[in-house]
Amino acid sequence: MSTEDKLQGLGLTLPTPPQPAGAYVRAKKTGNLIFVAGQLPLVAGDLKYIGRIGDDLSIEDGYEAAKICALNVLSILAAEAGSLDNIAQLVR
């Protein structure tokens, strides 16, 4: 079972990798490493959440924003590596 299949089993779908929101590259592959730029909670190019947790956003909104960012990172890694199955390890 592929990593993408496991994600689908959890009810998660990888989005299309987001385009950079500025003058930078979203990822850079160097040898066997892939460096990914910081992420915003973008859904189909639109910023889904704006504000601070506790002031403008609830804790649940924060969890959802983090989930969107994580899925965006995974989609970028899948695009760069050809498949998430080609990723051996994530490093913070």
What label would you give each PLM region?
Residues 1-92:
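Short, polar/acidic, helix-capping and beta-turn segments at strand->helix junctions
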